[in-house]
A protein has these predicted regions:
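DNA polymerase sliding clamps and clamp-related checkpoint/processivity subunits
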Residues: 1-17, 22-145, 153-245
């Protein structure tokens, strides 16, 4: 397996280092490695699939320190082989080998990995925002310009114009407004909604190779975006942030 695939996989499920603890599940019949993860504040759920099982059999194991795993992987070459060590049918470590060098990463008991709640029936999404290269680039730059702002706000004015605002406040504030060009027939917003801008930025940057994705918004307070290519499938759910002044 290419080491870059593993690095991209960890970036996508960890949101570039925000989430550390996850469960890896190998599904050999589908040639996939799957993860589900959740942020500490429980405002984002991430479901990421790597479409390459690295020739592993069906196993599950916990990775409790993704940042350390990434640092250890950095000493290896471009091509990596993966092998588990098991004791009493439990994976206790994973060995990554490349060009005469190997690393052993000690896995965690699944009981210490934060559980990710099962998704119930999703509400209908009434707003769809195409994630064009231009929109993504502008949003990432806007978040960089207001690095201390962690909230994005979706609003609709009396004329029906949709905006995404970083730095929104009911009082005078530094803010950046982005016009929203929604998909036809999915351009309604029934109320003002707030989501975590930092998380959305990391979702977008960790999936920057994907095109034609859509950010879907529900007035029920849920946002969803899916990215798919030949190597990965990534689904993220953001929950509304309430009580924003």
């Amino acid at each position: 397996m290419k080491k870059q695939l593993i690095n991209s996989f960890t970036d996508k499920y960890s949101l570039n280092g925000i989430i550390e603890s996850v469960k890896w599940s190998v599904v050999s019949a589908d040639n996939q490695i799957k993860t589900s993860s959740i942020t500490d504040d429980k405002n984002v759920l991430a479901f990421v699939t790597l479409k390459d099982s690295a020739k592993l059999s069906d196993i599950e194991f916990g990775v409790n320190d993704t940042a350390k795993l990434k640092k250890m992987l950095s000493v290896l070459g471009d091509e990596v082989e993966i092998a588990p060590t098991t004791t009493n049918d439990k994976v206790t470590s994973i060995t990554f080998t490349s060009e005469g060098t190997d690393i052993q990463y000690v896995t965690s008991d699944l009981s210490v990995i934060p559980p990710v709640p099962a998704l119930k029936k999703m509400p209908g999404f009434n707003l769809e925002i195409p994630l064009t290269k231009e929109f993504v680039s502008t949003f990432v730059k806007a978040k960089g310009a207001l690095s201390d702002v962690d909230t994005l706000t979706l609003t609709k004015d009396k004329k029906g114009k949709l905006k995404m605002t970083l730095g929104y406040s009911t009082t005078n504030s530094n803010r950046i407004n982005l016009d929203i060009k929604a998909n036809e027939g999915k351009n309604d917003l029934g109320k003002t909604l707030h989501f975590n801008a930092k998380y959305l930025k990391e979702i977008l940057t960790s999936n920057s190779e994907c095109e034609n994705s859509v950010l879907k918004i529900s007035d029920a307070g849920i946002a969803h975006v899916e990215f798919d290519n030949e190597s990965f499938n990534s689904n993220y759910y953001l929950l509304e942030i309430k009580n924003v002044a």
